[in-house]
């Protein structure tokens, strides 16, 4: 009798019924946004990053399409963690999938206070944004320093009861930073974020983004993200959420084979639509059945056997 392959999986202390969700940054904190992910076929919702104080973000324009992807610099616009936590409390109450908060701080004390408040709001986990490519004094600048990563992760993980996930960007010190994050108490990793990029309008003769420099996301960074996941998993066997250019089931399967247990969809959620999540889930299930695997877990890290 035909039995569908099992897609549910445990990752970073969470149990996901479907191993695909949205990446932080493309949606906010409200219940209606989590419903977009649920109705689109996703298995978890990641909220937009919040900061200690409210931020207006960078001047417009924030987004610019490029071949296969998007260059963006929103500037972490958000109402501050206190206001966001109120919205997330309502989202948690209404959602039937895990809700993951995302925070971007400065001093360790800020990270701890934000994370503690969001834990009280009922979120399932907290993702530490240590990789925003255009957040001066934090983000990628912080995430490239393994000692600084360990300091922030340790401060937060030692305070919370819920899982802490470190989101790291690509750098020459990624494997070291990932190892330090795990040693400091991170239950899982998100790899990677968008990559520093710029687009210039040749007729206006100036950068197209209000902030001039932004982050490139979408298909162009997918091979880089696959390499990042492969290298980090090879060294750490960590629980990994993979992000970077996922728009098809094949992209997702690449990440699973490299070592990821779940994938986050960003640019394609915007360019294709929320239904891309269901398309990926169904494609992955079909792939497992055709290839003779009983579960998603069976292919996690399989490429390392080659």
Swiss-Prot record:
An example molecular function term from Gene Ontology annotations: dihydroorotate dehydrogenase (fumarate) activity
Compartments, as annotated in UniProt: Cytoplasm
Catalytic-site annotation from UniProt: 132
Cofactor: FMN
Known function: Catalyzes the conversion of dihydroorotate to orotate with fumarate as the electron acceptor.
GO cellular component, one term: cytoplasm
Entry keywords, A to Z: Cytoplasm, Flavoprotein, FMN, Oxidoreductase, Pyrimidine biosynthesis
SUPFAM superfamilies attached to this UniProt entry: FMN-linked oxidoreductases
Subunit note: Homodimer.
Positions that bind substrate: 48, 72-76, 129, 193-194
Catalysed reactions listed for this entry: (S)-dihydroorotate + fumarate = orotate + succinate
Major subcellular location class: cytoplasm
Protein name: Putative dihydroorotate dehydrogenase A (fumarate)
